[in-house]
Amino acid sequence: MNGAELPIFSGFYRVLSRYAPRSGVSAAVIFIASLMLLLFAGADRAVAQIEQEEPDVSPTLRTFDPVSQLVVAKTQLTRAKFPVIDVHNHFGFRFKGDREGLEQYVGIMNSNRIVVAVCLDAVLGSEEAHLKFIGDGNEKKLAAFVHIDFKGAGNREDPKTLACNQLGFVRQCVEQLRVAKTRGILGLKFFKSFGLTELNADGSLIKIDDPRFDPIWKTCGELGLPVIIHTSDPAAFFQPIDNKNERWEELSRHPDWSFHGDQFPAREELLAARNRVIKRHPETTFIGAHFASSSEDLATLSKWLDEYPNLVIEFASRINELGRQPYTARKFFIEHQDRILFGTDGPWPDLRLSYYWRFLETFDEYFPYSEDSPQPQGMWRIYGIGLPDEVLKKVYHENTLRIIPGIKDRFLQAADAEENNNK
């Protein structure tokens, strides 16, 4: 067989045969050249076929979910060591009126030794509807804070129509707070939208320390209603979503959680404005939600606690941050043991709650902080901080009984009921 007998190269062979003699190229050279082209073409077709039959199975960051090969102690905890008050829950937003779901979670509370849970979803001025939802037999176990509806019947496309920009809005809020307390409301909640997305009539962002809201802060102090305030968010949420961002995987799934860009205030600006409010109202107790949004920087948070005696903190959805710095976190919890409340951002399933107990009560190493896989708030594991019993009791309930006076009766009744059930 020669090159002329290979159909795919017959044309090429005829060209070479016609012009090769003029240049002194032999038939053997023509044959070898044809054969080499044939081999290359066959290799290309083979590679293409392999690629088609065996697609790339290399893991991506989205699918990377390694199983640890560490062989370390795993303490199995199914309930807290002491009775717990959880000050940060969202039964309204999560259950959306589903009584069955709420009742199921009350069962989870009982099995985990959460004797009282505070829901932050009641709307100021219409709190009775939410109180009815979480009540109906659960009055001893569930309590509520209210939050302010800045939008009302208005349209965000026309900020002048928003409730917060109507004449007498602050005065109305003050009056509603007084009524809410008589109905059993225990405090006021501010969401992170206050400072990040709530608008003035001219379309500019409302500043957290705007003096027009001073009567609200002042009234809470007069009524003994603590203010749980969520300002800003994790530091990574204010950074570009790029290969340097430690929460890239999370933000790539939820780009709307990012506050990077000129349209948002700087994180430091938001926290400074919040701190000015805390300083301006020393008679009002402020609960810094999510460790006052400084769980990545406990040294700075420690300075705030020293500077503002009316500030306490809770760590809902922040064991992911605290548990990756166990030495620093343990020292912080012990140093500020009178200023820390327990919160989860629940309702959560049993497994998520068990990670809270392991984090606080054990020295377990390198374990998940969430039942979700991959881990949802940073692709890492956490370590336990093994708090002493006297500190655990303060974090679990003693501090909250002091900070939220209206919760004491519920706690005592629920704790007594739990003790009787265990006899």
Across the structure, where does each feature detected by a protein language model lie?
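Active-site gating/metal-coordination segments in enzymes
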Residues: 53-62, 127-257
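An N-terminally biased module of ancient metal coordination in phosphate/nucleic-acid-related enzymes
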Residues: 49-137
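H/E-rich (His + Asp/Glu) clusters that bind or coordinate divalent metals
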Residues: 262, 267-423
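Hydrophobic faces of well-ordered beta-strands that scaffold small-molecule active sites
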Residues: 85-89, 116-119, 142-146, 188, ...
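Acidic-and-aromatic substrate-binding clefts and catalytic sites of carbohydrate-active enzymes
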Residues: 92-101, 119-129, 151-155, 163-171, ...
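Bacterial N-terminal signal peptides
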Residues: 26-41
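N-terminal secretory signal peptides that target proteins for export/translocation
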Residues: 1-22
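Acidic (Asp/Glu)-rich catalytic clusters
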Residues: 76-78, 106-111, 130-141, 176-184, ...
